[in-house]
Amino acid sequence: MATLNEVYPVNYNVLSSDAFQQLDTTGFKSKYDEMIKAFEKKWKKGAKGKDLLDVAWTYITTGEIDPLNVIKGVLSVLTLIPEVGTVASAASTIVSFIWPKIFGDKPNAKNIFEELKPQIEALIQQDITNYQDAINQKKFDSLQKTINLYTVAIDNNDYVTAKTQLENLNSILTSDISIFIPEGYETGGLPYYAMVANAHILLLRDAIVNAEKLGFSDKEVDTHKKYIKMTIHNHTEAVIKAFLNGLDKFKSLDVNSYNKKANYIKGMTEMVLDLVALWPTFDPDHYQKEVEIEFTRTISSPIYQPVPKNMQNTSSSIVPSDLFHYQGDLVKLEFSTRTDNDGLAKIFTGIRNTFYKSPNTHETYHVDFSYNTQSSGNISRGSSNPIPIDLNNPIISTCIRNSFYKAIAGSSVLVNFKDGTQGYAFAQAPTGGAWDHSFIESDGAPEGHKLNYIYTSPGDTLRDFINVYTLISTPTINELSTEKIKGFPAEKGYIKNQGIMKYYGKPEYINGAQPVNLENQQTLIFEFHASKTAQYTIRIRYASTQGTKGYFRLDNQELQTLNIPTSHNGYVTGNIGENYDLYTIGSYTITEGNHTLQIQHNDKNGMVLDRIEFVPKDSLQDSPQDSPPEVHESTIIFDKSSPTIWSSNKHSYSHIHLEGSYTSQGSYPHNLLINLFHPTDPNRNHTIHVNNGDMNVDYGKDSVADGLNFNKITATIPSDAWYSGTITSMHLFNDNNFKTITPKFELSNELENITTQVNALFASSAQDTLASNVSDYWIEQVVMKVDALSDEVFGKEKKALRKLVNQAKRLSKIRNLLIGGNFDNLVAWYMGKDVVKESDHELFKSDHVLLPPPTFHPSYIFQKVEESKLKPNTRYTISGFIAHGEDVELVVSRYGQEIQKVMQVPYEEALPLTSESNSSCCVPNLNINETLADPHFFSYSIDVGSLEMEANPGIEFGLRIVKPTGMARVSNLEIREDRPLTAKEIRQVQRAARDWKQNYEQERTEITAIIQPVLNQINALYENEDWNGSIRSNVSYHDLEQIMLPTLLKTEEINCNYDHPAFLLKVYHWFMTDRIGEHGTILARFQEALDRAYTQLESRNLLHNGHFTTDTANWTIEGDAHHTILEDGRRVLRLPDWSSNATQTIEIEDFDLDQEYQLLIHAKGKGSITLQHGEENEYVETHTHHTNDFITSQNIPFTFKGNQIEVHITSEDGEFLIDHITVIEVSKTDTNTNIIENSPINTSMNSNVRVDIPRSL
């Protein structure tokens, strides 16, 4: 028997027992990423196509990812160059997905044509069953045979044969690929053609990438490089021509034609155009490493109208004439409302979509459709409750309902988020009132998509809606990668105070995004984020028929002139009629953090900007001194009172060039020209003696291998004499061939300084207790100083000091209540899905964690200190070190989040390690907004009063990123005992504890009232109330359907009921929004118990699919009988009249003539069920069901005369709706009689949420 204490433990804020594994990883994006990582791991090792097919098969067969998205995933990793020594064929890999059977694998595997056939037929409204017959079979067989020969040769490392077959295959594909778009199937064959074109382009990539192994000469490689460009061009033109020909069929602007057109564009985008957009990236001449191109293209739903048929619009006035563009990320939906003078009808009058598109400044903007506009009559305006949207929890489906009383009234909108939660808005008339009927329209995003915005026509009240979708995989933040080439659509940027962003007059279908038509004098602003310091080449993909000019600026660096040539047709000609090309702007060192670049068009000649690409070089994590060049052309004044010419705690440089003049001791001005290369001494100082006269100093001609960098230029004079100067030009450079010098301490005073610091770590000479003011971070700083002592000069002393600092580190670990504060041990940490452990950072001796921007998943670390580790009436210190943090929130909670602070810690580099008693990190610096930044080291305190061992509040510690562009690198985290509380402090903490305890007990009372009745209902399902045992013999589907859980962990379908209870269980943890919390654990256990009961019910039922969870599978249908979903969400078999029926034949194993059986049916209307049995079906049992509502009826137990029974359901008079039907064995102890349950049930509409009965087992 499950008890309340068992399912609802007393412990405060507990996580579920499996919380480490219970991340929200069930969504498409998580599964897709998981699959990509598996692909990348195998591909890097030189895996064959069949190996990747095995990986994909798991996701395909479970239905987690559809075959088309699997192929897109494969294509995304084929640009990755495998490890040295392996030859992996990208062409044969993709072919193994198109035609898996030609390799003899997976005998039940469908080829991609079979998978896409239903979708293609729906798009083009043409039966393509005979498509394969229309393909030239002789040429097709020749193609497959050559593919097989090439693949076998590659697999066997027979490169001579592989080269021959590659050339043969290229020849066949060049001449015969048109067989896949035969006459009559020019559009229908397009998805197949695109798949084979993938293989052709990748085949040429194989020839270039594997040229040395395959034996191609340099001349042959040059030919292949030209040919791959021509092939991409030709295949792209063939696809776009056929696509546009198909699009021409939808020229009418009425609603019906628009819906067909929208569906055609949607399907072709997913099946064809997304592939075409990748083809240019297959050219290794420009894409030498793995490539990730983001898509911002949109697809739209059909126009849907939640109104009666006689009020639906069909005219062209509501059809949008503009192309739907990506707007940014949707963060809020609002609906304006109006009420008539009588106060009887209140409806939505418009939609406001609010978007987030300016990450660094956290700006939002909105797009309105008919928002708060007056269409007719006297209205009072208002606004419904807004629906806020978390950036990493987008909307994936919508449901709009209008309720009617002579006119549109009582509108409501319900949305489903990615994690299964819901949001809603409604327009409720002030007086309430009865409504005739509700009209509901629902729409869901295609797999892998999210809602970008909702469009409504401007002409009338909200009768006409279109959902515009974009890819879930398109992140809010433009995050650079040190491993991949990243391409970002230009439309992810914005134009500020220079008019609106304009697009070309025609849509561009082949880029995965809409290019920006940058007008003369307009500046595109593009913001991005880097998690690591690295060098990148920045380039643009553009189109310009006459060449053009412009300017480029990265952050606050100098303006750079751009002379952009005419784009040639080396790759593709877009639908806009211009050719796309690449233009390299330059190479730059980009430090970790947020950045902005600007591209200004400064010419009357046109320029279309498609995307901005970042090509990474090696990471500069090991040489963080490198930084962007700086140029200062403005005048810099210095004198005795202000001697600093330039300084930076963020950047340092190897080469400095100064021009100007100076005056000292009353002399006349003299010219000053100084050209310095970096010094070699560890303190980075270099002195230039300037005499009374013109100075031209040239120190060093080149960088030296062991040189260090400047980070400060100061003018001084040995005496107290006056001096002043003017710098008219200053240039600061880096030469990128220096290295970091590890200091070596060899002087006796340095040993003395370090020894003093080691001794100061301890509270006494016994050295068994740390000093109270010593942090874990400072211990590691002292360790680094000890390590820098010279072995040759101080070998003995160094060994003794190292023993002491090791002891200090052990004591630090013992006193730290956090487990793994340096992340040497992760067992106690809860981490966001994308948080990673890293090492080798100049500001940390130990490991640290990187909290990246929360692009797709929350970014956090969390740990709880149990109550048993604490002492009563004690103050505890919480401390840690943040190397770099932007929008990182520290939360420490016992009685209610006592510490909650968002910190901004700027990116800074380590200062040279010295023997002095200072850290290698810098002092607090100014942020971009000139406000004082937070220090790298934080320290706070929290007070603990009396211990609550039963409730176990403990101390909860967490760091998380709270803005989309935030990030952090942290380590040396501690919670340690400080001191006993004073009497006054004890009284203060007692008051806080009393308030906390009162709220805690109230919450438990409320939760208990909610879950106890459900607990009792579930206990009643099972024999001996054992949830792991068997359900009772009299349990029916009806019993399960009447059990209402307070909320749902996940929901897969739209449920237009929005009458939520006043109190909702907190499914997720209060801090970690992607992990199941204590209430979620309760619901999960309830759902598991119901799932087990449902499974047992299914196994008892002799009828297959008696609950119609898989439509009408296993049933033979006649007439108009069909599966349908009712307005309340109920799935039923509908027999509309007496001419429709459904039949199923069942066969009983281990048949017993004496075994009794019973029929139970839950239905509405008048119908009959007959069961025919015997050798010739001569025996008939009949049961009649006649009710005006959904009610369960059952017959008297009976026996069968044979093991085969035919069950026949028919309507007797009008509509007959069957919710479920069962035929079960009757226990020999059962004494049930024929009864009708007269309590109608509602299986979907409820005050809480319906039990999530599985729809597929």
Swiss-Prot record:
Gene3D superfamilies: Galactose-binding domain-like, Pesticidal crystal protein, N-terminal domain. InterPro entries: Cry_V, Galactose-bd-like_sf, Pest_crys, Pest_crys_dom-III, Pest_crys_dom_I, Pest_crys_N_sf. Belongs to the delta endotoxin family. GO terms for biological process: sporulation resulting in formation of a cellular spore; symbiont-mediated killing of host cell. SUPFAM superfamilies: delta-Endotoxin (insectocide), N-terminal domain, Galactose-binding domain-like. Disulfide bonds: none annotated. GO terms for molecular function: toxin activity. Endotoxin with nematicidal activity. CDD domains: delta_endotoxin_C (cd04085). Toxic segment of the protein is located in the N-terminus. Signal peptide: none annotated. Keywords: Sporulation, Toxin, Virulence. The keyword Iron does not apply. This is Pesticidal crystal protein Cry12Aa. It holds the Pfam family Endotoxin_N. It comes from Bacillus thuringiensis.
